[in-house]
Amino acid sequence: ADMLPRYVELTAELGEARVRSLVEQQRFFDTHWLAAEGLIDIDRFAAMFGIFGLAECVNLLMAYEGRDRGGEARYGHDADANALGVRIVERVAELVAERPMPYCEGGGGRSYLHSQSGIDLDDAVTAGTRIPVGDEPPLLDHIATCAPHHHLFASGVSDIFHVDET
């Protein structure tokens, strides 16, 4: 029960170190041309807290709890697995919203939750809240799996929906 809060806090500590480095050591908002031109401002700055690997997390937990029905009950293909994914993201969102982040007045002093898009080099882990590539259910089921997460991500959710293969 304390694993998720622990790892959210460790990730937040890493994010805070990066924010402090950007502002205090690199003095980005004092020296970068975007700031000099007035295009960015420290008062509007916000950090993003990214989620990555939700599908694998859900699938591992379903198997660990003996509820995966031989691999059939997995994220994107099973109501219980999908509900578990939503519960995980809701809890992460609560923890991120509770955690102050310095210099992030653009986000009300907190990080924005972000569902990362991933890159082609990602191996054995799926980006953000996405369903693993190649394991996507039919389009409407795919959308129904991913849509319940969207309201929790002020900085966005990246996904790919295959409407037409051409």
Where are the regions a protein language model picked out?
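Short beta-alpha connecting loops at secondary-structure transitions
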Residues: G38, E72-D80, V157-H162
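Short, glycine/acidic-rich hinge or "gate" loops at secondary-structure transitions
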Residues: E9-Q26, R67-G76, P102-S115
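Catalytic alpha/beta core of large soluble enzyme barrels
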Residues: S111-T166
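Structured mid-domain segments that build the active-site/substrate or prosthetic-cofactor binding neighborhood
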Residues: A1-L61, E65
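General structural feature for long, well-ordered alpha-helical segments within catalytic domains
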Residues: G50-G53, L84, I88-V92, T145, ...
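Short secondary-structure subsegments characteristic of cysteine-rich extracellular domains
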Residues: D68-L95
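Flexible helix-coil linker/hinge segments at domain or subdomain boundaries
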Residues: A1-V8, R91-E105
